[in-house]
Regions:
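Noncatalytic, beta-rich nucleic-acid-contacting surfaces in large DNA/RNA-processing enzymes
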Residues: 2-188
Length: 188
């Protein structure tokens, strides 16, 4: 009824932007950092440039836009190359993403001031997040809209339960939704 907002209890958001971060991280793309982010543990990135790039997201690559900025500014890809990777992520084209991984790794290592072995180790962490993104990564605007809709559902569920459950049952997609909605209606 109110989307996947159970994780919000762990994060205790203070704004719609915090809600957006949680909503985006519970997608499959957040698998490798979800628990740390929900615990509000800032990610320790290997450079101040990456920290600055991801400062609004506790240091994590959360949105498609973060991935594009990372690919351009940290890995040296052009805007069109980064956008092609974003499209591959958006269309869940894992094969295209896999084909781009060597150039992302090489770009990261070339721009890193670290020795090659250290840079490769650092890059692999980000590559895992980008690979996870192929399962599904939200764009920032989509995440904000999703949160606002979820927030409104939660608001109506709490303050206007009759209207909420009526709307929920009228729009139920299957028998499980009807059964769950009816059980909730009896409970309230």
């Amino acid at each position: 009824g109110a989307f996947a907002f159970e994780s919000l209890k762990k994060f205790t958001p203070k704004s719609i932007f915090d809600m957006s971060i949680v909503t985006a991280c519970i997608r499959p793309s957040g698998a490798s950092y979800r628990d740390a982010l929900l615990a509000r543990t800032p990610h320790s990135n290997p450079s101040e440039i990456i920290d600055e790039l991801l400062k609004d997201n506790l240091g994590y690559l959360i949105y498609q836009e973060d991935t594009i900025k990372f690919l351009q500014q940290i890995c040296g890809l052009s805007g069109s190359e980064a956008d092609n990777i974003r499209r591959a992520i958006g269309r869940k084209q894992k094969d295209r993403l896999d084909a781009a991984m060597p150039s992302i790794l090489e770009g990261y290592c070339e721009k890193s001031p670290q020795p090659r072995a250290v840079a490769e180790s650092e890059a692999k962490e980000f590559l895992q997040i980008i690979e996870d993104s192929a399962s599904y990564q939200f764009g920032y605007n989509h995440s904000i809209a999703y949160c606002l809709l979820g927030y409104l559902c939660a608001y109506y569920r709490y303050y206007h339960p009759l209207e909420f459950i009526t709307s929920f049952l009228n729009n139920a997609a299957n028998e499980d939704d009807i059964r769950n909605g009816t059980a909730y209606a009896h409970k309230i």
